[in-house]
Amino acid sequence: MLKAAGIGVRLAGRWLLEQVNLEALPGEVLAVVGPNGAGKSTLLKTLAGEIRPTRGSVSMAGKALADWPARERACVRAVLPQNSTLAFAFRVFEVVLMGRTPHSRGLEGERDRQIAREAMAAAGVAHLAERLYPTLSGGEKQRVQLARVLAQIWEAPPDSPRYLLLDEPTASLDLTHQHSTLAVARNFAHRGAAVVTVLHDLNLAAQYADRLALLKDGKLLVVGVPDIVLTPEWIETGFGLQTLVMRHPRLGCPLVIPLGSASVLQPGEQLAHGK
């Protein structure tokens, strides 16, 4: 379990996170949602150990995150940032193979190469293996980086859960690859990993996440299954947006229909949930 206990983050005299308590459990996808500036990326970076909390603590598998040696932590926890910069002309296969560095210490064996190939297939980039990374589109680069972080924790050490942290993994992707990427994340969770992902699209979160955490102004408003979080009341509190929330006719999950921040419903209409 990845656990944030009362964490607060203060930078440049401003609290970016305040008193956040959150748990990410093996076998589930936890989606962090909220408006711009809510603290979503700050929370993910704090869970990843990139930002040390001003208050509170973060633990992984019952052990304080700060007490994990860097290489051991990298063997079980992988992070996909919003932007990954790589200017050198590596082949795509070489970029994905870099994910195996914590395990191989730079001496990759055949098993590492096989894992890289499997991760590329999972991320849908196997056909790009021999392409030079700088020649790829933004969406292709994002999917290659997803393959890299998958390869990093493809196999967990014995008796150790894995943690996959994704910061807006669908931001530069087309509709097809938004869904395929989140399907990969969900499948990874089904293999026993704890997946935490920052998402802006509430309908994607409803479809693929087991639980949602709604942030606003650095505070955690509510956490729970999609039916609990994705209500017209919570969405208006978090985003200042009026919505209709209905039941998806095929998937059964909440379906959020924006009405606009200043919309006025017609007489007789109600903000509905589950209808």
From Swiss-Prot:
The keyword Cell membrane applies. The keyword Nucleus does not apply. SUPFAM superfamilies: P-loop containing nucleoside triphosphate hydrolases. GO terms for cellular component: plasma membrane. InterPro entries: AAA+_ATPase, ABC_transporter-like_ATP-bd, ABC_transporter-like_CS, P-loop_NTPase. It is a peripheral membrane protein. Its main location: membrane. ATP binds at residues 34-41. It is found in: Cell inner membrane. GO terms for molecular function: ATP binding; ATP hydrolysis activity. Keywords: ATP-binding, Cell inner membrane, Cell membrane, Membrane, Nucleotide-binding, Translocase, Transport. Residues 2-242 form the ABC transporter domain. It comes from the Bacteria. Its EC number is 7.6.2.-. The complex is composed of two ATP-binding proteins (HmuV), two transmembrane proteins (HmuU) and a solute-binding protein (HmuT). Belongs to the ABC transporter superfamily. Heme (hemin) importer (TC 3.A.1.14.5) family. Part of the ABC transporter complex HmuTUV involved in hemin import. Responsible for energy coupling to the transport system. This is Hemin import ATP-binding protein HmuV. It comes from Gloeobacter violaceus (strain ATCC 29082 / PCC 7421).
